[in-house]
C-alpha cells in the first residue's frame, strides 16, 4: 500500500481508441491502441527525441536503452496508445505500479506539440484504461512544465503531492 492519494470522485468517461482527428496544424492524426507489436516503431520515434526535450531522464538517449525501456513498459498489464501521422508522433502509456495505481507517461515529438495531439492522446488513453478496468492513475511532472500541467488539469487530474521539485498529480477514472 502507498500513501498516494486519489480524488474521491471519478473524472467521468473518456473516449477510447481508435480515432482519427485533424490537429491544430491541419494534419490528420490517428490514435490507436498499441502493444508489443509497436516496439520497433516506438523505438524509432523515441530515437527522434531531442535530448533537451526529455523529461525526468526518459526516454533514454541510447538506442539499446530505448529498446529495453520500451520493451519493459509494453509488457504485462500496461495500457498503451499511439498517435500516428507519417509514422509514430506520440505515445501514452499506463504502467501498473506496485500498489493499486497506474503511472502515466506521455510523449509527443516536438514538431507535433501544441496542436491538440496530447489532449486527444491522453483522453483516448484514459478511455482505454477505463475499458481495461483501471481506476487510479498518477503521474509526476516537472513544476516548470506549464503546458503539461494545464493538459493534465484539463482532463481532470488534481495535484496530490507538491512537496518536491516535481508535482504528483492523480485522477480516478
Regions inferred by a protein language model and the residue ranges of each:
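Conserved acetyl-CoA pyrophosphate-binding loop and the N-cap/start of the following alpha-helix
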Residues: 112, 116-124
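C-terminal "cap" of GNAT-fold acetyltransferases
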Residues: 140-146, 155-156, 162-173
Amino acid at each position: 500500500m502507498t500513501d498516494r492519494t486519489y480524488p474521491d470522485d471519478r473524472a467521468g468517461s473518456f473516449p477510447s481508441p481508435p480515432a482519427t482527428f485533424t490537429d491544430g496544424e491541419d494534419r490528420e492524426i490517428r490514435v490507436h491502441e498499441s502493444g508489443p507489436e509497436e516496439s520497433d516503431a516506438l523505438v524509432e520515434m523515441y530515437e527522434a527525441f531531442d535530448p533537451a526535450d526529455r523529461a525526468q531522464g526518459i526516454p533514454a538517449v541510447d538506442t539499446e536503452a530505448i529498446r529495453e525501456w520500451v520493451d519493459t513498459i509494453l509488457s504485462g498489464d500496461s495500457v498503451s496508445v499511439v498517435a500516428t501521422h507519417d509514422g509514430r508522433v506520440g505515445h501514452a502509456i499506463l504502467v501498473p505500479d506496485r500498489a493499486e495505481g497506474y503511472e502515466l507517461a506521455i510523449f509527443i515529438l516536438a514538431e507535433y506539440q501544441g496542436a491538440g495531439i496530447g489532449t486527444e492522446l491522453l483522453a483516448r488513453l484514459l478511455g482505454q484504461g477505463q475499458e481495461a478496468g483501471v481506476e487510479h492513475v498518477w503521474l509526476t511532472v516537472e513544476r516548470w512544465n506549464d503546458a503539461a500541467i494545464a493538459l493534465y488539469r484539463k482532463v481532470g487530474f488534481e495535484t496530490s503531492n507538491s512537496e518536491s521539485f516535481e508535482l504528483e498529480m492523480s485522477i480516478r477514472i
